[in-house]
Amino acid sequence: AGQPLIVHQMTALRAAGITELVINTGHLGVQLTSVLGDGGIWGLRIVYSPEPPDALETGGGIFQALPLLGSEPFLVVNGDVWTDYPFVRLPAAPVGLAHLVLVDNPSHHPVGDFSLRNGRVEETGAARLTFSGISVLRPELFANCAPGRFPLGPLLRRAMTDGQVTGEHYRGGWRDIGTPQRLAELDGELRRRHKEQRSNSPSIGD
């Protein structure tokens, strides 16, 4: 509450020792660059990967940004999620092509996305969880892709078929705030928490 979601994410990433960010920008590109700049005031180095007005979806956006990301595995955090996940827990180099953070299914997505069994993420299975939008990916995941608009999901599913996707189940705070209503609900909840914390804090003279 009180700060843009992306600033919350940036602060959490900085706390985990991550200092170099690539931000995909679409229709909000001008606003983002004017507010965030080069990231220096947060102790970060930000470079931007501008997307066309019709956007490229997650897969196409990452593929376009690959020259900025280098040849090593990289962390991806969707811009429309809030979480208190400790990013320092993530593997620097996944065993396979991808490592996904999965969470309990929210009410608006009760069927989930994938299953987790013995540390491997699978498309099939009875107990399904929701992909949080947090992942560590290897550039090789995009080896056969071409520039343009495409989703990330099919690439992950293909890698799952080959046993190349690991994962973990995070049970802490996570919210998909992809709609104005869900964003307003989260903001209200965080404001209530902040107010409760202040009222429970000892005052001088206690």
What are the language-model segments listed below?
Residues 1-32:
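N-terminal glycine-rich phosphate-binding loop and ensuing alpha1 helix
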Residues 5-8, 61-64, 155:
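Well-ordered alpha-helical segments embedded in enzymatic catalytic cores
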Residues 1, 51-55, 145-146:
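Short, flexible loop segments at the rims of nucleotide/cofactor-binding pockets, characterized by
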Residues 33-34, 38-112, 116-118:
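Conserved beta-loop-beta/alpha segment of the NTase-like Rossmann-fold superfamily
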Residues 18, 75, 82, 88-93, ...:
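Catalytic-core segments of class I nucleotidyltransferases/pyrophosphorylases
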Residues 1, 18, 37, 69-70, ...:
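Short conserved AdoMet
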